[in-house]
Amino acid sequence: MARRGKKKGRPISGWVIFDKPKGMGSTEAVSKIKWLFNAEKAGHAGTLDPLASGMLPIALGEATKTVPYVMDGTKIYRFTVSWGEERSTDDLEGVATKTSDNRPSRADVEALLPNYTGVISQVPPQFSAIKIDGERAYDLAREGETVEIPSREVEIDRLEIVGIPDADRTEFEVECSKGTYVRSLARDMGRDLGCYGHISELRRIEVAPFTEEDAVTLAELEQAWPPLPPKDEDGNVVEPTPRRDFSAIDALVIDTGAALDCLPQVPLTDDQAQRVRLGNPVILRGRDAPLEADEACVTTRGKLLAIGYIEHGQFKPKRVFTTG
């Protein structure tokens, strides 16, 4: 039997709420964060387009097990729609496909907003990660194919105007569900207003349960990053190699359990925690312990231990974390 290779990197776990700069792709951002923390494992909770900036929650280590909970969270975006052009990508990156000299008034736009709140039907952009017969829509679009992307239901909790810099642009803020394409929102509003439109600025400012206050910039991360061991003229590490101190950058990591604010959380005793670590159910004690829950998590000494469900006052683990 082949021996498994040793994992490279540190077994650090938690969330880094990265303030992604414009021009950086989501995959590139994950690779950068993984390298800065020298982490064994990393992944993000929801793609952010390269032309967009703002919050990209990145999970390290065991926190990758909680990614689905963050992906399901409500998102808030601030964005600018430039009127007068519809573009192939529905943002600045594409070429103009339709143009108009019409420009909407504030009253025109405000009258339209109720049509875009609540549960609405939306067709994702041609340039999107949606799979069509096993292929990404953006790959097909780059090959010149026009694909039929089925509409999907999304939920818009709030959509409002936050600024009008000039007649050509309107600034909005939207609070929406997972799967909402803000580019499609701009495209559809432009069509309904008879003037066409595309996204010219896009920033994500919240991914529940995390807020903009949790975000850290690349500059802040690099400032806290421990330098690599010194090398001589031949590129060899100078001996003895000093141990790298990651404490400053690790202080920017948010606890794994923060992603599970939507779930009931129950603290366990040390004995109960040991049983759960072995995959066994435990009876929950205390007046406040829930009797039933489709999903819940348990903690030990303030650290997340497991996700599972509660049935007749008994917690049954489904996913156990090594950090607890």
From Swiss-Prot:
Belongs to the pseudouridine synthase TruB family. Type 1 subfamily. Pfam families: TruB-C_2, TruB_C_2, TruB_N. It catalyses: uridine(55) in tRNA = pseudouridine(55) in tRNA. One of its GO terms (molecular function) is RNA binding. It comes from the Bacteria. It comes from Brucella anthropi (strain ATCC 49188 / DSM 6882 / CCUG 24695 / JCM 21032 / LMG 3331 / NBRC 15819 / NCTC 12168 / Alc 37). The active site is at residue 49. Signal peptide: none annotated. This is tRNA pseudouridine synthase B. InterPro entries: PsdUridine_synth_cat_dom_sf, PsdUridine_synth_N, tRNA_psdUridine_synth_TruB, tRNA_sdUridine_synth_fam1_C, TruB_C. The keyword Signal does not apply. Keywords: Isomerase, tRNA processing. GO terms for biological process: mRNA pseudouridine synthesis; tRNA pseudouridine synthesis.
